[in-house]
Amino acid sequence: MTARPKKPSPQDGFFWKTKTLEQLSPTEWESLCDGCARCCLEKLEDEDTGRIYFTHVGCRLLDGDACACRDYPNRSDRVPDCVRLTPKEVRELTWLPPSCAYKLVADGRDLYWWHPLISGDPNTVHEAGVSVRGRVERTETEIPVEELEDHIVSWPALLPKRAKLKQRPR
């Protein structure tokens, strides 16, 4: 008697459902980033409360249209305070947006319909209104640090309504 072949699971191929952040290969780790670039916005911390405030000011290396770093391989050398996410940091950083795939996976949640690993299309993150495309006013080199408070916005910490849908709108 031969064993029946294992029925493929709907989870097969969805590495983020079967692995912890620590188990991801470097390629899987990088592919988990949805390309929203919200983490590339300048943030301010209230010294008294520790609360983090987002601005619509991008890092000096952020290409706001592409929602990508202009020098990703050398970003830490060129921007010393650039945060290189690790599984530990994903679990500890309170400012990661609610849509962050690293945070979702760390919390045992699934990715949204617009994530490129689900949709197969890197543009759905923009279509869903999750990315910073069209919302970055300037870069940090154009705004004096003293004026960053004038550029505080709330949208990076929120999830747009159409991004919360269970599937891509028609």
Curated annotation (Swiss-Prot):
Pfam families: CxxCxxCC. Transmembrane segments: none annotated. It comes from the Bacteria. InterPro entries: Puta_zinc/iron-chelating_dom, UCP006173. HAMAP family: UPF0260. PANTHER family: UPF0260 PROTEIN YCGN. This is UPF0260 protein Rpal_2074. It comes from Rhodopseudomonas palustris (strain TIE-1).
